[in-house]
Amino acid sequence: MKLTCMVIVAVLFLTAWTSVMADGSINRPDIAEGWQKFFSKARDEMKNRAASELNKRCAGIGSFCGLPGLVDCCSGRCFIVCLP
C-alpha cells in the first residue's frame, strides 16, 4: 500500500513537472517566471557550451592575477601572481 501511494505521488509530481516545463516560455524568456528562467538558461548552455560558466579557464602558476578575485588561479591562491 505504501509503495502504491509513493508511485502515485511520483507520477503526479512528474506529470506536474512536465506541464510546468512544457508551457512554451522557452521561446519567450521575458514571460518566464521562477524556475523556468533557470532551466531555460540551462538549456541554452547545453546548446552553446562556450556560454557555460563551468568552462571558465584558470590562470596557470606564475601568471599575473593582480589582486585576489580578479583572475581565477588554477591553484586558487593569488598574490600578484598565481601561487602553487
From Swiss-Prot:
Residues 23-57 form a propeptide. Residues 1-22 form the signal peptide. Disulfide bonds join 58-74, 65-78, 73-82. InterPro entries: Conotoxin. It is found in: Secreted. Expressed by the venom duct. It comes from the Eukaryota. This toxin activates voltage-gated sodium channels. It shifts the voltage-dependence of activation to more hyperpolarized potentials but has only little effect on channel inactivation. It is active on Nav1.3/SCN3A (EC(50)=3.98 nM), Nav1.4/SCN4A (EC(50)=4.99 nM), Nav1.6/SCN8A (EC(50)=1.27 nM) and Nav1.7/SCN9A (EC(50)=2.42 nM) voltage-gated sodium channels. In vivo, it induces nocifensive or pain-like behaviors in mice when injected intraplantarly. The cysteine framework is VI/VII (C-C-CC-C-C). This is Delta-conotoxin-like Bt6.4. It comes from Conus betulinus. The lineage of its organism: Eukaryota, Metazoa, Spiralia, Lophotrochozoa, Mollusca.
